[in-house]
Amino acid sequence: MISLVNDGRPRVMAHRGASYDRPENTAAAFAEARIQGADWVELDVRLSADGVLMVNHDAHYADGRPVRQVMACDAPADTLNLAEALEACEGMGVNVEVKNLPGELDHDASDLVCEAVAGLVGA
């Protein structure tokens, strides 16, 4: 179990990085979270068309394209894959939220996304 305090102070988790100051779920947001003293970062993952775990909150990118239908190499420029995000969050804990809701465009009834996250995080 993880302690909710660190050196006598509550642990701070940055939701999608420092998303008030930088674009959410980006390397800049994670770096700013570290600068601001975050202990943890929460981020969201979805599967791309070519099976890469991409860090994005919604089922669609901001430009309207569905994450599940876009190859990782064609994602918006500041979009990270999970491996890149974990590297950007080095030194902080990471809470990976798997977006897998029934009724959403990218719902994964076979839990392949969960298995992929577990495989990458456990590596």
Positions of predicted regions on the chain:
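Phosphate-group recognition and catalysis centered on beta-loop-alpha active-site segments
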Residues: 1-123
